Amino acid sequence: SRGLGDVYKRQQEGYPYAMFRVGLYLEKAVLGEAKPEEAFAWYTKAAMADENEGIFALGRCYKQGIGTEEDWDKALEWFGKGAEKNESRCLTELGLAYENGNGVEENPQKAVEYMTRAAEQDYGYAQFKMGDYYFFGCGPCLEDNKKAVEWYEKAVANEIPMAMLRMGDYYLYDYDSLNESEKAFAYFKKAAEYEWYNEGLGICYEMGIGVEDNETEAFKYYTLAADNGNVTSMYRTGLCYYNGVGVKQNYAEAYRWFTDAAGNENIGAAYYLGKMQMYGEGCTPDPEAAVQWLLKAAEKNNDKAQFELGNAYLTGNGVEENDDIAMEWFEKAAENGNEKALKITGRRRK
């Protein structure tokens, strides 16, 4: 195309930005097939000519192993050169490196310093990270929901979907007792426009929070989020199939989703997986395997799993029958408010 010819002409004339663009075209397969090694060579030329885009791209290549061997030392060297020029993405990369200990020793203080510099330049992702630093606490950023929200809102204004989800969670789970959960829906819906999902939008539709309740829509958004790897949504998708919420009841599908979620450490899913294996719901009964999943959930204080373990020891299903151990689990379940366990322990005490 004429535009591409202009880029080549300019790189031949020594325009550093054009060198970067040629590298980008080669990396992203604009010219046909991707040619990462050639892209790396052009990024190097642009970076050596002190072009900001080239500097960042070269650092990214060394970080991700694009067209060259992964090399954190060289990646940080180039990100450092960009940071000296106050390049926001390079500052952000240095912040992430110090946050996670990639190529350097973990240093929360430096992570915050670099991320603050990037965020103050109105760089959206850095603003999101600053929100996280204040929300979860990082180095000099003590937990401070007010400051976290200020940064998240700036990131939302810069169209960062992750910040939209954080703000949705902030209102949905009412971290500061504002009783404004209806505001969550708008943030979750906005994130969905960018195809970013967590369990929040499904919960809003299922519970009628900020929108009229709609189980079909709830199931739709749970599955979208689950397909994107959100573990809580995998669990909730399993619940929908198990209970017939927004979809026809299907134990086999419920079992599949609970398996995925439990494999990712979701405690509720571990309970349901154990329960289904115990009674053969959507699968072949396997009491021994069931006990292992129930134990995993029970040890995290899931009262239903504790009650089921009590039953298992009481009847010798999947374990050797033992009334004393059964009562221990019933007692633990009762302490966690399980009504069935309370009845059993109450009768025993009389």
Regions found by a protein language model. Name each.
Residues S1-Y8:
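Short, small-residue-biased leader/transition segments that mark boundaries at the very start
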Residues K9-R10, K45-A46, K81-G82, R117-A118, ...:
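Canonical positions in the second alpha-helix
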Residues Q12-P16, K28-V30, M48-N52, Q64-I66, ...:
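Short helix-capping/linker turns of helical repeat alpha-solenoids
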Residues R21-K28, I55-Q64, E93-N100, K129-G137, ...:
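Hydrophobic face of amphipathic alpha-helices that form TPR/SEL1-like repeat modules
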Residues D324-K350:
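Leucine-rich solenoid repeat scaffolds
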